[in-house]
UniProtKB/Swiss-Prot annotation:
NCBIfam families (alphabetical): pdxJ, PRK05265.1-3, PRK05265.1-5
Family stated for the protein in its record: Belongs to the PNP synthase family.
Pfam family, one: PdxJ
Subunit-level organization: Homooctamer; tetramer of dimers.
Gene source species: Synechococcus sp. (strain WH7803)
HAMAP family xref list: PdxJ (MF_00279)
Gene that this sequence comes from: pdxJ
Binding locations of 1-deoxy-D-xylulose 5-phosphate: 9-10, 45, 50, 100
Entry's EC annotation: 2.6.99.2
Localisation per UniProt entry: Cytoplasm
InterPro entries per record: Aldolase_TIM, PyrdxlP_synth_PdxJ, Pyridoxine-5'_phos_synth
GO molecular function, one term: pyridoxine 5'-phosphate synthase activity
Protein name: Pyridoxine 5'-phosphate synthase
Length: 247
């Protein structure tokens, strides 16, 4: 049974749209936990477009589930993580011109640098996950870098036409099995919604799904706690969808 990590970046996006103090993502994280979130995820970007350093510091003090800090693999970010001590760091690619993370980290081309940074974080007691596309070469590179976790990028699955989604789901299923055979633990996220999450949640060996935008969008109508409850029910009790066959 997969657990649910709630990404609260989009709450901070609303705040930063007016450069004001509300809505504050820190108390919103508590509401997400009250709704059943198994963890809270935030992405501290280099350009600080949504989550701020202050948010991360306060969340470390207040989150009672797990705090997952997404960040670029830069020296400045490593130093912040070592100071804050989140429960997990997820290393992600980052480009200033992107609206949101557009794809997985190219671990294969950065093995030496990533291995060093992963070692420093894990030696400090912070498990590291790498956000990657569901590809054998990237998973092998993650293993070689001695990461403990991978987070599979589900964006291609989420954005695929319904006729193509079964093959994308198969890629995620195969990548999950391969990663586990390599000794890696597996999370997934990006673009998942109330409409497409169940087949991914049902993948054998999938440990956690990190979901943000769709929950915050639903919260506008029903409130954050209820939005989280609804997603948690789908993640924990995924139904069999005839479109995807038996999974």
């Amino acid at each position: 049974m997969a657990s649910l990590g709630v990404n609260i970046d989009h709450i901070a996006n609303v705040r930063q749209a007016r450069r004001t103090v509300e809505p504050d993502p820190v108390p919103m994280a508590l509401l997400a936990e009250l709704g059943g979130a198994d963890g809270i995820t935030v992405h501290l970007r280099e350009d600080r477009r949504h989550i701020q350093d202050r948010d991360v510091d306060l969340l470390r003090q207040t989150v009672r589930s797990r705090l997952n800090l997404e960040m670029a693999a830069t020296e400045d970010m490593v130093l912040i993580a070592l100071r804050v001590q989140p429960d997990m760091v997820t290393l992600v690619p980052e480009r200033r011109e992107e609206v949101t993370t557009e794809g997985g980290l190219d671990v294969s081309s950065q093995r030496v640098d990533l291995t060093s940074k992963i070692s420093r974080l894990q030696d400090a007691g912070i498990p590291v996950s790498l956000f990657v596309d569901p590809e054998r070469g990237q998973l092998e590179a993650c293993r070689d870098c001695r990461a403990r976790w991978v987070e599979l990028h589900t964006g291609t699955y989420a954005e695929a036409k319904w006729t193509d989604q079964p093959s994308e789901l198969a890629r995620l299923t195969e990548a999950t099995a391969l990663a586990r055979a390599m000794g890696l633990r597996v999370n997934a996220g990006h673009g998942l919604t109330y409409q497409n999450v169940e087949p991914v949640a049902a993948i054998e060996g999938m440990e956690e799904l990190n979901i943000g935008h769709t929950i915050v969008a639903r919260a506008v109508a029903v409130g954050l706690q209820q939005a989280v409850r609804e997603m948690k029910a789908l993640v924990q009790n995924p139904r069999r969808d005839p479109l995807f066959g038996s999974y």
